[in-house]
Amino acid sequence: MKKRRTIIVCICILAAAAFTLALALPKKSYAAIGRNARKHYAEYETRHSDPQDEPAKDEDDDSSEFWFPVPEGYLNKKTDEKKYVSSINPDDTPEQWDALEDAVQMREVSQIPADILETVSTDELVLYCMNYNLFIDFMLFNTMQDGMENVRSDYNGIRELMTRPDAAESLIRLYKLYDLDEQKARDSVGCIRLCYLEAMLCMPEILNSLTAKQANELAAACAQKISKIVNDENSPYSVSTTMYLAAVSQYAASEEFAEIVNASSGAKRYIEEGILVPDEISDDTLGRIVSYFQEL
């Protein structure tokens, strides 16, 4: 009995010593965390910017589509995915599309009919928006915000979506279900379409309606996608809009994160303009941002 008590006392002493040592060891500074994050991001950027040979495409075995493939579980019913595509489009009706005189006519035939717009559910309205013929136009501007404002002015689907009180809920659910590999295999423009979905989530009406829970769900979904992209050397996806979505959603919903960002002119510029200049953000600020997301 005395021997057992002695062993227990020794274990307690060792545990106390280990705990004291852990407290005495210097914690990794925010600046060190920031430097490490900057290093990894630079390595990713270098790898991502290097031109890589595209795998040869077998035209006889191309299963990808021009419309948006609906992820399983998004709708609670089976549906014809092509019902959300405009009747006149560059893939199904190329002759009619090519006969259109200018961009004005292209936009006109790409609108959602009024009777559908007034009655369609928000979940399905999102799918109409994902299939907008000219959605890629959002990439033709200096900033993503300017691009999406242009799409808003040109397309009644986005304008209607931004009035729906449950738009954020529908968009977040779709984003969480967006499997990178599956969508890339099924969608001929899957990588660009993901950026478009992320750009919709970054619109002011969506960000301003987010609850803290929704913002955290978005951050978790973004982190999952970023991890998959950066760890796959051959990934065709970019993390740019994904990183931005994670940042602006937290900035809108978290006072703590907003305080970190507002203390850095470079970080604030990134949030407000979508322009990332790494040298404008200090290692300390970057470390605080990384630590914030790690603790979510």
Language model segments and positions:
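Low-complexity intrinsically disordered segments
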Residues: 3-5, 17, 43
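N-terminal Sec-pathway targeting helices
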Residues: 1-13
